[in-house]
Structures are given as C-alpha cells and as structure tokens.
Amino acid sequence: MSQSTIHKIAVKKRTETGKNENNRLRSSGMIPVNIIGAGVATSGAVNEKELAKMVHSGIRQSTLIELDVEGQGQQKVFVKEIQRFPEIDRIRHVDFYKVVPGQKIVTKIGIETTGVAKGSKTGGQFEHIIHEIRVKTIPEDLLENLTIDVTDLDVGDSIKISQLKVPASWEILINGDPIVTSVNKTKALLAAERAEAKGAVPDDAKAKKGKK
C-alpha cells in the first residue's frame, strides 16, 4: 500500500470574480481556484507554475493537498475538478474540496502490481485487468495507490476484488467480484497440452501391446 502524499501550495485570497478578473489573473501567472466545503466556496488564486508542477507530478483524486490560504492558514483538500483550455495544454481553473476528518468521501484509487508472476515464467500470460477502483472511505485511510504482490500467481490463478487487502473503512464501489489480475494459458501452451494429450497412450494399452 502507498500512503497518500501531501502536496503543498499557497493560495492568495481574492474578492473580485468574473471573466475579466480571471483573465487578468492568468495574464499575471496566476490560476483562479475555488475551495469548497460545508456549503461555502472560497475564491482564491495560485501560482500557475507551481500548480502545473503539482498536477504533472501525477496527483489523483485521492492525493491529499495542503493549501496555505492567505488569512486563513492551512487547509487540507482534494482536487474536485481541473478545467483546461481545450486548444492548449494549460490549466484554466481548479476546484478543491475540504477534508473533514472522519467524514467518508468517494474517490478513485489506483491499483499497481509488484513482482513477477510465477506463472508467466512457465508459459502463462499475466494480465492486469483493473487499474483503478472507486472507494468510499475516511480521509485518514486514503491511499494514493494500492499495491498488490503477484509473485505467487501461477497459471490459472487470479486475484479478485474480494481478495484485496485494504483498510477496514474501505467500501469498494463495484458490481460483483471481478478479477483484478490473472495468469492465463497462452495459445501456444494450450496447443502444446492438446498435442501432448493426443500423443499420450494409457498404461494398460501399453501393457497389452507389449504382450503381442
């Protein structure tokens, strides 16, 4: 398991809003943001370069971010939405939502694997099917990624959602119990098994043939 990394960024409060003000902010190297929590939205602005660096570092919805808000101090948040200009790779606006300790939230958690499946060394094909899951949990138990060890997976083995080792507070929001990873027989391995089966002679048949 990979604990959620805390990223930090400063937020300058703003009282003026609207299209013209937002354009003025962007031309000065700042990006408008909203901080949402308890039904209240606070308008602010962050340094565009610092924000882009944080976003490009691979943050997810489950990444904990610490905002240093002008006049309000530090606030822990998650990213709710990142808006971009469609014609260029530039951030237009970001919505954050505040973390309330002990209050469950719904977010997405990535699934990573570690190790080399045993079955892939003997002709099997390893498959990583589900790369992300939706989870309802408390902020204190959030993970940026869930890492599963596939070293012991042999040909024909699989790991299902119900077999994942996760914090007790987690409720995985998914239908059924699908397979996350598996090691399947390749076409070559199946063909070899069929050929071997066709060429096999039962022991009693061999004995009868020897008596003739």
UniProtKB/Swiss-Prot annotation:
GO terms for molecular function: 5S rRNA binding; structural constituent of ribosome. Keywords: Ribonucleoprotein, Ribosomal protein, RNA-binding, rRNA-binding. It comes from the Bacteria. InterPro entries: Rbsml_bL25/Gln-tRNA_synth_N (IPR020056), Ribosomal_bL25/Gln-tRNA_synth (IPR011035), Ribosomal_bL25_b-dom (IPR020057), Ribosomal_bL25_C (IPR037121), Ribosomal_bL25_long (IPR001021), Ribosomal_L25_dom (IPR029751), Ribosomal_uL5_bac-type (IPR020930). CDD domains: Ribosomal_L25_TL5_CTC (cd00495). This is Large ribosomal subunit protein bL25. This is one of the proteins that binds to the 5S RNA in the ribosome where it forms part of the central protuberance. Part of the 50S ribosomal subunit; part of the 5S rRNA/L5/L18/L25 subcomplex. Contacts the 5S rRNA. Binds to the 5S rRNA independently of L5 and L18. Residues 1-25 are annotated as: Disordered. Residues 13-24 have a biased composition (Basic and acidic residues). NCBIfam families: bL25_bact_ctc, PRK05618.3-2. One of its GO terms (cellular component) is cytosolic large ribosomal subunit. Disulfide bonds: none annotated. One of its GO terms (biological process) is translation. PANTHER family: RIBOSOMAL PROTEIN L25/GLN-TRNA SYNTHETASE, ANTI-CODON-BINDING DOMAIN-CONTAINING PROTEIN, RIBOSOMAL PROTEIN L25_GLN-TRNA SYNTHETASE, ANTI-CODON-BINDING DOMAIN-CONTAINING PROTEIN. Belongs to the bacterial ribosomal protein bL25 family. CTC subfamily. Coiled coil: none annotated.
